[in-house]
Every structure is written in C-alpha cells, then in structure tokens.
C-alpha cells in the first residue's frame, strides 16, 4: 500500500525542516504497536568476518547450517505473525550474504525512509536493494546519507522527537560526519539529538541500548558510556540491565512489539526473566545459527509502521 499523502520519491525531506509526516507508513518510536516490519532474506545468508562476534564464531570452527538458519528464521516469522505483525521482505540478492540484517541499509522515520551508507564493501549493495523495496512498497525516501559511512543500527529512537545516534569512526561502521549530517536534519525537524561515540568492538549502539516500552530500556551497563546512562535516567527512563556476556551474544538486541510485548532470542535469559517479572509477554525463538554471525532480532528488522505514541 503506497502512502496516501506521498508517492515514492527519492527525497521527501524539506531542507528547512517541517517535513510532512507520512499518513500510513512510519514510526515515531521503537515501542509503539508494531504493525508492519521489513526483514532481510535468509536464503543467501552465510557467516562472514564482519564483527567480533562472527570472527570468533569462524575462528572456533563452528559449523554453519543454512537449513537450521532457515528453520530458526521461520520461527521468528511465526512470532511476528502471532503478534499481529505483517512481514515484508527484501528480495534476496545472492551477492549480499548479510542482507538478512535489514536494520542497517535503511532507517524508517515518521517522514520516510533514510537510505544509509554501508561501511563494508560486501554490504554496500544492500542500500540499492533497499531503495527497490521502498519503491515497491510506495514509501518515500526521506534522504540519503552522503557525509560518510553510517548504518541503521546506530540510529536509536528513544521516544518521539528524541534520538540517540552512535558512531565508531574510521575503524567502525558509522562516521562522525555522517552522524552530524543526521543531527542537522533532525534538529531542523525539532528533534532532540544525542550523539555519542562507541567502541568499534560493539559494532552498533543497538547492541547495548534498546527501548522496550515507554520509559523502559534494556541497557548493558558494563559497556554503555555512563554519559548515555545518565542522559537516559534524566529522562526518567527505567533501565533493565543486561549482563555483558548475554549482550555480546545479542541478548540486548531485541524488538519491542508494543503493548508490553517483546521479541528476543531464546538465549537472552536475564532480560527475559526481568521482563516476565514486569508482566511482559515474551516471544523467544531460538536464533543461535543466525546470531553467531553477528546480528540479533533488532538487527534483522526495520519497523515500517508502528502506531504513533
């Protein structure tokens, strides 16, 4: 379904701000009720040395099994369906083995999709396939990141009109100049923007900080900069701490489905227990064959449409 206000366009952003909000598509938070989600394909997935996680997996000679990955992926699809979420997918490209991680090639906003600028050469083609997908769905492009490399896992909407942006520099996935470009755009839209550098070891900010519900976040306190933690607490956001080892295994990289429901990997034991104690409904597929390649459920999705909050 194309957006009622805007047809597909390659630039929906107004240079001076006040860009119109899309009528049908878009998300102004990470915790409004998720209605439509964009996933990458599993058919072309294989492990590459893309991160500290996947390098360790390959170094330890763990055997990759595509059939197992497909079964686990389908379990995740079933979880989304059970939660009432409509699933959309990128068309698989055999030259893009990390296309499964749909978080990074684009960023969905209330104003349209941002096309990012992937850092690793074997992922750059994902940006082009993302444009095709948004064209097919009739979702306008807000703009393209051009000032440097930037990946979607470093764009973290904390609450409506407020975003946390991470960057890692030349050794990582997102550059400071690109983060600044985003900051300028969103400040013109009258958003609050908090930019922070993170160690390239952690790949993206969504490894360690993810919103679960209004005023509730999962955070790895062992690896998150204290300034970020203080900033969140000053916003009266309650923090559920995720242990370092579970964080490295993508246990903090989870998806809020809205209405106190969360999708997380089966291995995320601590967060699962804490959320159940808070009264949350949990969807917890086994995704170990996928996560050992360096990405979790949050990495694998892009929220195309959430109920506004």
Give a label for each model feature.
Residues 1-309:
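The feature marks the mature, well-folded catalytic cores of soluble enzymes
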